[in-house]
C-alpha cells in the first residue's frame, strides 16, 4: 500500500510538472491580443507603436493615458491577452483600484522603461512591477534606496542573460544598446532577473519577471527613445516578453540579436 501511494504521488508530481511546462509555453491559439498604453512622456508614440504592426501573430490597439485609464478594469482580460505599458501617467485612485483588480484576475503585463514612474501616489504599483524610481532617498521595507541617478540618455549598455533557461532569455545573444542609463532605483528582492548588465552607470537588473495575483509581469528598464527602439535586440526582447506574458510559446527561431 505504501509503495502504491508513493507511486501515485510520483505520478502526480510528474503530471504537475508537465502541466507547469505547458502553462509556461502553451501552443498558439490565434493572434495575441495586445493593448498598448502611451502618453505622458513626450516621445514619438507612432514610432514605438509601429513596432507592434511588424510582429507576427499579434494584433494591437493603442490607447492614450491617462485619458483612457478607465478601460483598465476587470473584464478587459476577456478582450486582451497582454497590456504593454509605455506611458508615464498619473491616474486617479478609483482607476488605480480598478486596474489592480484587473491584474489580480489575470492578464499579461509588459511594463517598459519610464512606465515604472506611472500611477504616482499609488504605492501598490511598485509591488506590481517590482521596482520604483526614487526621486529622493526612500525607505522601502526597512531599507533605504535612492535617489535614482541618470548618467545619460545614449549610454552604451551591454546586456547579457541572467537566466539563460528562461523563455525570454533562452538562446538570446548578448547585445549592446544605446539607451538611458540610470541606477540606485529600488528593485524588489523577490523578482526573477532575466537580463542584467555590468555597466556601472546602469541599474544591474535590466529586465525581470514577477507575479501579481494571476498576472504575469515583465518589466524592462530599456527603451528611452528611437535609438533604443530601433535596436533589433530591443524588438526581440519585447516580442519574447509579450509571448511569455500571454502564456504562449516563445519562438527562439525568430531573430536572434547580433
Task: For every predicted segment, state its role.
Residues 41-42, 90, 116-117, 199-201, ...:
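Short, solvent-exposed loop/turn segments at secondary-structure junctions
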Residues 1-4:
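Positively charged n-region of N-terminal signal peptides that target proteins for export
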Residues 50, 57-59, 146-216:
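Catalytic beta-strand/loop cores that center a nucleophilic Ser/Cys/Thr
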Residues 89-167:
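A glycine-rich, often tryptophan-bearing local segment used as a flexible ligand/cofactor-contacting loop or short
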Residues 27, 31-37, 43-119:
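Helical hinge/lid and interdomain linker segments adjacent to catalytic or ligand-binding clefts
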Residues 24-31, 64, 201-204, 211-258:
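Extracellular ligand-binding/catalytic regions of CAZymes and related secreted enzymes
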